[in-house]
Amino acid sequence: MADKYGPIFSLQLGIHKTIVVSSWAVAKECFTTHDKVFLTRPKSLAGKHMGYDHSVFLFLAYGPYWRDTRKLLIVELLSNRRLDVLKHVRESEVNSFVREMYEQWISNGGGGSKAVVEMKERFGYLTMNVILRMVAGKRYSGTEVYSDEARRFQKALGDLLHLVVLSMVSDAVPLFGWIDALRGYTGEMKNTAKEIDHVLGRWLKEHRQKRETLSINESEHDFIHGMQSVMDGSQFTEHDTDKAI
């Protein structure tokens, strides 16, 4: 279609007019030069059921709440200073990863003995532990002691990422939302949201209790602690504070 209609053209997908870009120069204009024009996203079934009715940054429309949330993300999670403070997390997790590999080698007799190792799964544990420690101060160890809660959360997170990218009939034609329900996607989204909400809710409660009873040094100050500190007693958002975090 790009060969026929050029590097930029529009399609009508249900109730939404969609622009298709196939040129890096045009893409730069859209997402760099005029990025604010393209920030607003249409409401979606995934945003409704898995994004706390479009309160999560991924599903937000551009506006004051989007700007405030983005500023907090950059300062509390993605700033050079924050990444430097939490450098020890990445180092310790890589060390643990290598140590577990070495211990498995020793348990197999060492020397010239060989063993098949599922590296994809192990790298998944490594990535998950780094992210969870930086965000929530949690560590779900790999291999056999990887907890049931960790597996449930990892599965729910994988389901969320899978469901978010699927095309839903109701996103294009809301009147036909019943089709998504018949296909089972609506129920899957609700169940996935409950699984994630259960875990995140417990983390928030634990962090709140820890802040009330203990002093927290900077190296232990994860993303949830930072967000709670900013939001406690502030008028940052009209949304529920826990949902915003």
Swiss-Prot record:
Its required cofactor(s), as named, are: heme
Q: What is this protein called?
A: Cytochrome P450 CYP82H23
Q: Which domain of life is it from?
A: Eukaryota
Q: Which PANTHER family match?
A: CYTOCHROME P450 82C3-RELATED, CYTOCHROME P450 82C4-LIKE
Q: Name what induces it.
A: Down-regulated by methyl jasmonate (MeJA).
Q: Family membership, please give it.
A: Belongs to the cytochrome P450 family.
Q: Extract the GO molecular function terms from the UniProt entry.
A: heme binding; iron ion binding; monooxygenase activity; oxidoreductase activity, acting on paired donors, with incorporation or reduction of molecular oxygen
| InterPro entries listed in its UniProt record | Cyt_P450 (IPR001128), Cyt_P450_E_grp-I (IPR002401), Cyt_P450_sf (IPR036396), Plant_Cytochrome_P450_Monoox (IPR050651)
Query: Which keywords label this protein?
Result: Heme, Iron, Metal-binding, Monooxygenase, Oxidoreductase
What the protein does comes down to: Probable heme-thiolate monooxygenase.
**Pfam families, sorted:** p450
Tell me which EC number(s) this protein carries: 1.14.-.-
Q: Tell me the Gene Ontology biological-process terms attached to this UniProt entry.
A: terpene biosynthetic process
Organism lineage = Eukaryota, Viridiplantae, Streptophyta, Embryophyta, Tracheophyta
